[in-house]
Swiss-Prot record:
Pathway: Amino-acid biosynthesis; L-histidine biosynthesis; L-histidine from 5-phospho-alpha-D-ribose 1-diphosphate: step 7/9. InterPro entries: Aminotrans_II_pyridoxalP_BS, Aminotransferase_I/II_large, HisP_aminotrans, PyrdxlP-dep_Trfase, PyrdxlP-dep_Trfase_major, PyrdxlP-dep_Trfase_small. GO terms for molecular function: histidinol-phosphate transaminase activity; pyridoxal phosphate binding. Its cofactor is pyridoxal 5'-phosphate. It catalyses: L-histidinol phosphate + 2-oxoglutarate = 3-(imidazol-4-yl)-2-oxopropyl phosphate + L-glutamate. Coiled coil: none annotated. This is Histidinol-phosphate aminotransferase. Its EC number is 2.6.1.9. GO terms for biological process: L-histidine biosynthetic process. Pfam families: Aminotran_1_2 (PF00155). HAMAP family: HisC_aminotrans_2 (MF_01023). Homodimer. The gene is hisC.
Length: 361
């Protein structure tokens, strides 16, 4: 008598790649000083919340929003000086990374540096792309020659170059960025310049995007704009490439509540610029206070966070928690032994942070 084989563990329809990938690594911790997610420490101004609320109340809630957020795309295009047909917006840039992998990475190659933003690698693994990582140089700079070799050695897929870099906070020389982007574009790679933190660095690679055929800039409202809770990210590229990407975006994906908030923010960018200026000043103040520490090293940063190298990341992390500060451990990443990633907070939060770091031994 033939025996029925035992069922496979877990739901039979789940792909092995999905089974093998861990959930996104984040556990919220309730402490007075939340410096673990590179957030803007300030909420959206109350008067702008009121303006956004008035927009929401004027809209019929029983009707679907724009199919592809055309009104909001036009507003972003006006702010960026871009063709609206070359703007794609989704609920957070993480969604854009997913559709970029769907566009050019499934069964092909995703190439970036090591370490890198974890969502690049998670989406590559989830969607069955070959992941190629080129280790950063010891000073955290882009490994230009190794990157060029990797671009030439693999069939084109998706190439990410992050400026400034996460999680190190380092900005590369514009000529190095230009060199790898132009080669990648010429070889047919979908080339993504992730500019999530560009306001804190004063960098802008839109001209590289304009000059390229397969190049795009990835941007977000979560950092400098202080709208992480709204969930909105966008990209700038040419209309042809944007049209292909738009096919992968679900219909009606941007609700009118999000549209109301983002449109209001774009009409009042001065609040964002003021907060970026404060963050840059506070970043410098923290660096000046900590750089002479006897056992810890603070690395220069062009973002709203910085890396702190400690003798023992676990002990340092627990020390900061005891002082009411939560940050993010990075010590398991290549080249970041002993490192913690800490966001720049309000002046009061930074006072507490500086005192806690100076007490570390």
């Amino acid at each position: 008598m033939t025996q029925t084989p035992p069922p496979a563990p877990g739901p039979s329809g789940v792909r092995q790649a999905v089974r093998d990938i861990p959930a996104y690594p984040f556990t919220p911790i309730d402490v007075p000083y939340k410096l673990d997610q590179n957030e803007n420490p300030y909420d959206f101004p109350p008067e702008l919340k009121q303006k956004a609320a008035e927009r929401m109340l004027a809209h019929p809630w029983n009707r679907y929003p724009d199919l592809h957020a055309d009104t909001l795309r036009a507003a972003i295009a006006g702010y960026e000086g871009w063709d609206a047909a070359g703007v794609v917006i989704t609920p957070g840039s993480n969604v854009l990374i997913k559709i970029l992998t769907e566009l050019g990475g499934i069964g092909q190659t995703v190439l970036t540096t090591d370490p890198t933003f974890s969502v690049y690698t998670l989406e590559a693994a989830m969607l069955g792309a070959e992941l190629v990582l080129t280790p950063l140089n010891p000073d955290f700079s882009l490994p230009v020659e190794a990157t060029l070799q990797a671009l030439a050695a693999h069939a084109p897929g998706v190439f990410y170059v992050t400026q400034p870099h996460a999680p190190t906070g380092h900005s590369d020389r514009p000529e190095d960025v230009r060199r790898v982007v132009e080669v990648a574009d010429r070889l047919g790679w979908v080339t993504v310049i992730d500019e999530a933190y560009s306001q804190y660095a004063g960098t802008d690679y839109r001209e590289l995007v304009r000059a390229g055929k397969h190049v795009l800039s990835l941007r977000t409202f979560s950092k400098a704009w202080g709208l992480a809770g709204v969930r909105a990210g966008y990209l700038l590229t040419n209309p042809e490439l944007a049209g292909h990407l738009q096919k992968l975006v679900s219909a009606f994906t941007i609700n009118f509540l999000t549209q109301a908030v983002i449109e209001t923010a774009l009409e009042h960018p001065e609040y964002m610029r003021e907060r970026v200026a404060e963050a840059i000043a506070e970043r410098g103040r923290i660096y000046a206070a900590v750089q002479g520490h006897p056992t810890c090293t603070i690395f220069p940063s062009n973002t709203n966070f910085f890396l702190l190298k400690t003798p023992d990341a676990d002990a340092a992390y627990r020390h900061l928690l005891e002082h009411g500060i939560v940050c993010r451990r990075q010590d398991k990443l290549r080249g970041l032994d002993g490192c913690l990633r800490i966001a720049v907070g309000t002046p009061a939060e930074n006072d507490a942070l500086i005192a806690a770091i100076l007490a570390l031994r």
